[in-house]
Amino acid sequence: MTRPVVTRFAPSPTGFLHIGGARTALFNWLYAKKTGGKMLLRIEDTDRERSTQPAIEAILDGMKWLELGWDGDVVYQFSRAARHREVVETMLAAGAAYRCYASAEELTQMRESAKAEGRTRFYNGLWRDRDPSEAPEGVKPTIRLKAPLTGETVIEDQVQGRVVWQNDNLDDLVLLRGDGTPTYMLAVVVDDHDMGVTHVIRGDDHLINAARQKQIYDALGWELPTMAHIPLIHGPDGSKLSKRHGALGVDAYRAMGYLPIALRNYLVRLGWGHGDQEIFSTKEMIEAFDLPAIGRSAARFDFAKLESLNGHYIRQSDDQTLVTLLEDVLRYIPHGAQIAAKLNDTTRAQLLRAMPGLKERAKTLLELLDGAGFILADRPLPIDPKAQALLTAETRHLIGRLRAALEAVTSWSAETTEAAMRAFAEANGLKLGGVAQPLRVALTGRTTSPGIFDVLAVLGRDECLARLADQASE
């Protein structure tokens, strides 16, 4: 009987949840969902100097924001150190590991000799077969794996295919340090085994680790999980991903106004494809995703594509959801608290009314917020330079006349104000644009905005007449 699929996402809490880690988490989550399995979350916090509680919280927060839920409790690797040492004791008893008393000077000499001779295997087996009675007094040994000296170590990888290493190039790696703390290589194997992990899906920078970890699995007589090493993410020019290219934390994308569903959709297409389809619902992603469809070549990050996808999802979102998302993003942006202070039942209703026009232009929530600035602006309205250039004496005089015409409108709506302005334009030999642009400048402080009659309706009669008065001349 086939075992249920168990994947795991195992970040190190030394910083934020970066974009590559987020994609790894997504691929693990998708594969678990597709197969009816589970995705577990393990925090690999054995590096006590670099692991921090804020980083752990940032990882958990990023996962929750991306809506990548995990099954069961979070496992903390450091808390399992006693179990890791227990496994090493069984390996020592079985002759699969040995105590190494080599000094730092001896190890340095081995490295230099290996480098000079062009060997990748640097440890020369100094203590591999020596009698323990020869151990120097007062020296705490490391524990090393008694790795095979000949033959091959082979990984049948779901993405990379068959990968072969010659065993004479692989060291007797350290399992326990002299202070008794387990190494990453050992801890990962023990934890994956004990957690019942069936599929290890991670970046291909871990491919060499797969060979070393397989040797530990073999020494313990444990079944190796299915391996899938996914390509790294590069910048648009093919170079290593940098902050300039998008190597940012998930929290930064939230603060830039991206939607979780858009980021998930973008990340799933970095290295994985399903024909020419670009836009996937979560359900479609789960149904279509499979490990062999992941390519081997590094994926290239493209901000323009991400923005385009985000704009699509903004346009597809219902208006009330967008008002809620706008309010949520204020917690993560500069001056967000000042903007939040202006939100009340009236301004929320205005945002909701304006949303159909606002969302057609916006590619991010920040652009949406910027477009909605006229709703939340205080009088006298700040006027941007392009709009200021249009506020000539002639235009200010026209604004005064437009205000007078609008003041006569009693039942205020987009339709009634449009009718009044069309009548004014016709009576004065003007095109509608010659009326709309002065109104736009006076009411929004910009030369672009949602439809001007929608703006009039959203702001309401009193606010519109007051803003027009601010810019008008007699």
Swiss-Prot record:
Keywords annotated in UniProt: Aminoacyl-tRNA synthetase, ATP-binding, Cytoplasm, Ligase, Nucleotide-binding, Protein biosynthesis
The record, for InterPro entries, names: aa-tRNA-synth_I_cd-bd, aa-tRNA-synth_I_codon-bd_sub2, aa-tRNA-synth_I_CS, aa_tRNA-synth_I_cd-bd_sf, Glu-tRNA-ligase_bac/mito, Glu/Gln-tRNA-synth, Glu/Gln-tRNA-synth_Ib_cat-dom, GluQ/Sye
Enumerate the catalysed reactions.
tRNA(Glu) + L-glutamate + ATP = L-glutamyl-tRNA(Glu) + AMP + diphosphate
Residues annotated to bind ATP: K243
What EC number(s) would the UniProt record show? 6.1.1.17
List the ranges annotated as motif 'KMSKS' region. Answer: 240-244
Short motif ('HIGH' region): ranges = 11-21
Task: Give a GO cellular-component term.
Answer: cytosol
Matches recorded under PROSITE patterns = AA_TRNA_LIGASE_I
Q: Which GO MF term does the entry hold, naming one?
A: zinc ion binding
From the record, give the cysteines joined by S-S bonds: none
HAMAP family from the xrefs? Glu_tRNA_synth_type1 (MF_00022)
Chain's role: Catalyzes the attachment of glutamate to tRNA(Glu) in a two-step reaction: glutamate is first activated by ATP to form Glu-AMP and then transferred to the acceptor end of tRNA(Glu).
Q: Which family does it belong to?
A: Belongs to the class-I aminoacyl-tRNA synthetase family. Glutamate--tRNA ligase type 1 subfamily.
* Name of the featured protein: Glutamate--tRNA ligase
Q: Tell me the organism's taxonomic lineage.
A: Bacteria, Pseudomonadati, Pseudomonadota, Alphaproteobacteria, Hyphomicrobiales
